[in-house]
C-alpha cells in the first residue's frame, strides 16, 4: 500500500517540502485546491523527486476538459509517467457562487467530463479525428498546430473524488480510481462504496480491481494522552465542517447521525463556527478516523485499509521541509503501513 502526503500550495519552501517527503519514504505527493492553484505544486514535485504526484483534487467543472487534458499531457510527459490526474466536483454553492459556473447533476456530468478528457488524449496519441459530443461538452476541432508533442509514456490515470454511491459507480465505470472522501468510514467503504464501484465496473465489463480506492481520511496521533486529545479535537473541528454540509448527509445517515447534520448545518448558517466542533462526539471521531499512538495508527491503517485500498494519505509531519525533529519516527511509521 502506497503512503502519500499533502503538498501545500506553491511557495518558496515547496522544493524543501518535496525533498523532505521523499527522504521520509513517502511514495506520492498530493496537491489539493483550497486557497491555491493545484497544478503548479505538481510540477515542482515532479521536477524535484521521483515520487508519484497527483492533483487531489482539482475542481473539474470550472475548467474545460481541453484545458485539463493539455495540462495532464504536459505534466505526464515532463514527469516520465509519474503524474496522476485527480478530479472533483465541489458542491453546488461553490460552483455557482465562487466559480460562477452552472450546476447540474454532478455524477453524470463527471462521467462525461472524464470521457471528454480521454477522447482528447486518444486523438493526440493516435491521430484519430476528435469527435466528442456530449450533453455538457463538445470537442470536435483539433489541428496539428494545437496537437502537443508525442508522449513516450502511458496516459495519466484519472481519479475522481466521491462520497456517495453515484460517484463511486462512475469511478468504477470510467475512472482509474476513486479518491475517498474523508467522511467515508471503513464500514461505509465496505458496505456502500465497494458494491457501487463493482456495479459501475460491471457496466463497462471490467474488473472492479481496475478502479483503485485511495483513502485520505482523518488521523489523530499522540505519544502522550495530552497530545492525542489535542489531535482528536483538531479532527473534531474538521469533521464539524464537513458534517455541516447537506451534500455529505448520506455518510452521516449511514451511522445514524442525521440529527447532528441538521444541527451543524444550522450553526454554519448562523456563522457559529466555534460552537460547531463541540457537537462532534468521540464516537464520530473514532468511527470516521484512526486514533492512537503513531504505531497503533500505522498498524490499524495497514490492517483495516490494506486489503481494500491502494494508498493512504498520512500527513504526520505538520511542517514538512522545516521540522525534522520526528524524521526517524515518521519514517518508521511509513514503513509499517507499507
Identify the function of each model-found stretch.
Residues 1-338:
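Active-site-adjacent structural elements that line small-molecule/cofactor binding pockets in enzymes
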